[in-house]
Regions:
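Nucleotide-activated sugar donor-binding and catalytic core shared by glycosyltransferases
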Residues: 1-333
Length: 333
């Protein structure tokens, strides 16, 4: 989104965004007459030729792992500049195996490759790539570090369980009674009748739904969010964010709570997410494997402006990746 916004700042530019899955297509909503969305056909040579002939792009942009080899090759043959950003590369990917050499050679024809981490940059250079730049993660440019005021009477310290699944919820529920002075906010990844019923069972009678609270009074100790679209603002109110997905290898957004100054907690399966290890290395995030790890963290929880500032500064220092990609794209058009 940050890159798209920069491109359409010029009223002469138009962007076609392609999707392969119906869920991605249907969930993307952006009301602007410079932006169009469509499905991308299967990555066959003829499909790529026909599709690119119809849309006639000035520049083709690929994100992360969505590397469509026939499309990249046809772009190269037709002298259409190509850019990959937020790329992550390593020796276990198929195009760096002996049977993927043909794909590796196609990737070398990309005009620009911007990597999300230095390890990817160094690996590509060791494989003979020249068109590589390490610029970081454009998602840092998308988050806002400004804190919001809220009518919720939240006590401090506050822990928010964000984008949670049952695994994280059960871990937290096992320690809540041991730390009654902490405010708990539960924001599940899915908000539907089945999940809300599960949450009521897990957290019991001491919990209350957001839709039931009286804003003029202090909220209950365990608040369950049963409305979508609130999580980003709620991170402004919390001190610690326990983010879901870290036990399944599908870690949810940890950049957003860091931008609001939270200390971050997540499960141990985070290898696919370079930002997770970066935050651990910078001491603004911790990983846990069970309720006992969580208890050790909660024993020392306190509201600290120093900790909040450290998380926000981490995010601010990572901003700027979008501008680098944008300038490269505009210079090639």
């Amino acid at each position: 989104i940050p890159l798209i916004k920069k491109i359409i700042n010029n009223k002469n530019n138009q962007v076609i965004i392609t999707f392969f899955s119906p869920s991605g297509y249907e969930n993307f909503k952006y009301n602007n007459n410079q932006i169009f969305k469509t499905y991308i056909p299967l990555d066959f040579n003829k499909n790529a030729k026909d599709f690119l002939y119809i849309i006639n792009p000035k520049h083709a942009i690929f994100v992360k792992y969505d590397l469509w080899m026939n499309f990249i090759e046809i772009c190269h043959k037709n002298k259409i500049p190509t850019t990959v950003f937020s790329g992550k590369f390593h020796n276990k990917q198929w195009y760096f195996k002996f049977y993927g050499q043909w794909a590796k050679n196609i990737l070398k024809n990309l005009t620009n490759i911007f990597t999300i981490d230095k390890a990817s940059n160094d690996f590509l250079r060791s494989e003979g790539f020249q068109n590589v730049t390490f610029n970081g993660d454009t998602r840092y440019d998308q988050v806002n570090t400004n804190l919001i005021n809220s009518s919720l009477k939240i006590k401090s310290p506050c822990l928010i369980l964000g984008s949670s699944w049952v695994k994280e919820e059960k871990i937290l529920s096992n320690v809540i009674d041991k730390f009654p002075d902490i405010q708990y906010i539960i924001a599940p990844h899915e908000v539907n009748k089945k999940r809300l019923n599960e949450l009521q069972i897990i957290f019991g009678s001491k919990s209350k739904f957001y839709s039931q609270i009286d804003f003029s009074k202090e909220i209950p100790n365990i608040l369950i969010i049963d409305k979508i679209g609130l999580l980003s603002d709620l991170y402004s109110l919390s001190d610690i964010a326990f983010v879901g997905g870290g036990f399944t290898g599908k870690l949810h957004n940890i950049i957003e709570p860091a931008a609001k100054g939270n200390k971050i907690i997540f499960g141990p399966n985070h290898k696919k997410f370079p930002e997770a290890q970066l935050m651990i290395d910078n001491e603004i995030a911790l990983t846990i494997k069970d309720e006992f790890d969580l208890m050790e963290i909660l024993k020392s929880i306190k509201r600290s402006n120093t900790n909040r500032k450290k998380s926000i500064e981490f995010v601010l220092n990572k901003k700027g990746a979008t501008e680098i990609v944008y300038k490269a794209i505009m210079n090639k058009n």
